[in-house]
């Protein structure tokens, strides 16, 4: 069985974390040799950067600072976690990657998406996902889910208004148009179990 680099993307409240947990279980049961990781984070240094970027109280952070910090964390994640796993034949399942920067920092912060892309390509070089699952859910539904989930860890980006989250969604649509060959859109209004089964079936096809 070959190893591939898989990413989960979607707006806040799309259910990515829940689906990622279920996928972890189902992929293990299917006998897939893989690691599960996340961004921002995924390595000791990158997790420290995550705490800075998402920390409540850092609302004054400049948008370009945000882009550069996340790209730096991503670089460390790639060299310390993702590439080593792929090199020994392990599939990588990652909660968010470069596309999140294009949508959240690029579109969400009204920055030039091409510039954000170039910064990230410098950081990751040739380590691009083989398959990206976009969990598609309306912004208002996602924010309602966040509000209803009292046990969820709330970060700085969750506190942005709906206009910001609508910009993020529009940004994702642009990203999908940039890389249509690796994206699969998944209806995230369905149950986490249904979403997981849809994604797992495609993963097994990709690995065949």
Curated annotation (Swiss-Prot):
Coiled coil: none
Reactions it catalyzes: dTMP + ATP = dTDP + ADP
InterPro entries according to UniProt: P-loop_NTPase (IPR027417), Thymidylate_kin-like_dom (IPR039430), Thymidylate_kin_CS (IPR018095), Thymidylate_kinase (IPR018094)
Pfam families for this protein: Thymidylate_kin
One cellular-component annotation, GO: cytosol
Enzyme class at the top of the EC tree: transferase
CDD domains in the record: TMPK
Function: Phosphorylation of dTMP to form dTDP in both de novo and salvage pathways of dTTP synthesis.
NCBIfam families: DTMP_kinase
PANTHER family per the UniProt record, alphabetical: THYMIDYLATE KINASE (PTHR10344), UMP-CMP KINASE 2, MITOCHONDRIAL (PTHR10344:SF4)
Protein name (Swiss-Prot/TrEMBL): Thymidylate kinase
Organism: Listeria monocytogenes serotype 4a (strain HCC23)
Gene name tied to this protein: tmk
């Amino acid at each position: 069985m070959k190893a591939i680099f898989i990413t989960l993307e979607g707006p806040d409240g799309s259910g990515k974390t829940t689906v990622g947990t279920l996928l972890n279980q189902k992929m293990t049961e299917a006998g897939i040799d893989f690691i599960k990781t996340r961004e921002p984070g995924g390595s000791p240094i990158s997790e420290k950067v995550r705490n800075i970027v998402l920390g409540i109280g850092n609302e004054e952070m400049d948008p370009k600072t945000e882009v550069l910090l996340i790209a730096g964390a991503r670089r460390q994640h790639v060299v310390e976690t993702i590439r080593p796993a792929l090199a020994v034949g392990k599939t990588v399942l990652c909660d968010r990657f470069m596309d999140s920067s294009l949508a959240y920092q690029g579109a969400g912060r009204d920055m030039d998406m091409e510039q954000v892309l170039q910064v990230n390509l410098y950081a990751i070089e040739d380590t691009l996902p083989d398959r990206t699952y976009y969990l598609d859910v309306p912004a208002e539904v996602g924010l309602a889910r966040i509000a209803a989930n009292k046990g969820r860890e709330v970060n700085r980006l969750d506190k942005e208004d709906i206009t910001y989250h609508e910009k993020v969604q529009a940004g994702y649509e642009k990203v999908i148009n940039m890389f249509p060959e690796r994206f699969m859109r998944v209806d995230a209004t369905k149950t986490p179990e249904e979403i997981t089964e849809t994604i797992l079936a495609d993963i097994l096809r990709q690995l065949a």
